[in-house]
Amino acid sequence: MAVTSVLTGSAVTFRLLKHAVAGPVQFVNLPLSMAMVAGYLAGPASGFTVGLASFILSDMLLGLGVWTIYDALASALVGMAWGYLRGVECGATLFTLSYLSALAYDLATSVAFYSTFMGAASPLTVLTVAVTGLFVPVAGGSLYAVGPVTEALTALLTSVVVRRVRQVVGEAA
């Protein structure tokens, strides 16, 4: 319970600080990273809770919208999945799994978002726009390659935190 509370509070606080400094520009997904860390350290229920609560709580202060549902549920599911990766110790493997998890999260939330706002567009069109939007602006944005950069930085943060916490816990034992 303590790990879940601390990581949820950290995710919300750092997301709010990131928004205060950089605005809505996404360059690291802090709630998703903390959900993965929670799942890895404390199990599937903790990962799910941190993923769900961190997006809902931070969006209550930043602005709730239909995206809150997508973000919270996708982050919760990724965090829960990380509860089953506790045996993974290799840093490169942790980074790779973090990157793939962040990519899956981004694709799922982009498809859900564009499905909602593109009306009667075909599923193939929605998928094309969602994937393209990870690399080039498609809906009025101005950032290029924001998806891969966000995924890489989120994966780096997650893998470093997991390894460091494991190291500290190992030294304390």
Task: List where the protein language model places each region.
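Membrane-helix interface segments
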Residues: M1, P44-T49, V88-L94
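Hydrophobic transmembrane alpha-helices
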Residues: M1-A38, A45-S46
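Alpha-helical transmembrane segments of multi-pass membrane proteins, especially transporters
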Residues: V3, L7, P31-L32, M36, ...
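Short amphipathic alpha-helical segments, especially helix-boundary/capping motifs
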Residues: V6-F14, L30, S54-S58, A121-S122, ...
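Transmembrane alpha-helical segments of multi-pass membrane transport proteins and ion-pumping complexes
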Residues: A11-L16, Y40, P44, F48-G51, ...
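Interfacial aromatic-anchored transmembrane helix boundaries in multi-pass membrane proteins
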Residues: T13-L30, L52-R86, F113
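Membrane-embedded alpha-helical hairpins and interfacial helices in multi-pass inner-membrane proteins
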Residues: V21-V25, L64-I69, Y84, V88-A173
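Short amphipathic alpha-helical patches
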Residues: L32-Y40, M80, Y84, P123
